[in-house]
């Protein structure tokens, strides 16, 4: 079993290291269900936590639908995360209550080209058909 925690602070990273967690998901604003963290904390995480590091890629807390400008911003966030030595990224794009294949695939392609793992996040909870959605996520390249 993998022991993972969502972390938004330096103290959280230190605690994750102290308690030998396997993985952290670095984000900010946990009270908003997590947003893309600053470059600074991503960089610090590299030296403070020896385990696997994933970064949340979520530019706003207005649901999980993103326009093309926001997708472009998310791609840049994925590239920045790679420069900070992360192992994977966490994101999810919906179209109403269904998976937005096109936009998720755009993000997956950027991440996979950088050898990053991709995890579909909390947006899954808003999908109408969980079983079908799980199969679809696997088919489009989420790990």
Regions found by a protein language model. Give the residues of each.
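N-terminal entry module detector
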Residues: 1-32
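Active-site mouth loops of central-metabolism enzymes
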Residues: 1-9, 57-75, 119-129
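Hydrophobic faces of well-ordered beta-strands that scaffold small-molecule active sites
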Residues: 3-5, 24-26, 53-57, 89-91, ...
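Active-site-adjacent beta->alpha loops and helix N-cap segments on the catalytic face
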Residues: 10-15, 30-51, 68-72, 76, ...
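Conserved, mostly hydrophobic/aromatic
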Residues: 16, 81, 107, 121
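Glycine-enriched alpha-helix->loop->beta-strand junction motifs that scaffold or abut catalytic
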Residues: 18-24, 48-52, 85-88, 113-115, ...
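Active-site gating/metal-coordination segments in enzymes
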Residues: 75-90
């Amino acid at each position: 079993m993998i022991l993972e925690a969502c972390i938004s602070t330096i103290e959280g990273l230190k605690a994750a290291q102290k308690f030998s967690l396997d993985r952290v998901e670095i984000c900010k604003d946990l009270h908003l269900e997590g947003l893309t963290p600053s470059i600074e904390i991503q960089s610090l995480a590299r030296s403070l936590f020896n385990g696997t590091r994933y970064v949340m890629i979520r530019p706003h807390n207005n649901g999980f639908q993103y326009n093309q400008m926001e997708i472009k911003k998310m791609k840049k966030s994925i590239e920045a995360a790679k420069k900070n030595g992360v192992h994977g990224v966490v994101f999810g794009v919906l179209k109403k209550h269904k998976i937005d294949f096109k936009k998720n695939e755009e993000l997956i392609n950027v991440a996979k080209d950088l050898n990053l793992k991709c995890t579909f996040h909390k947006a899954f909870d808003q999908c109408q058909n969980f079983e079908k959605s799980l199969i679809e996520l696997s088919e489009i390249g989420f790990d």
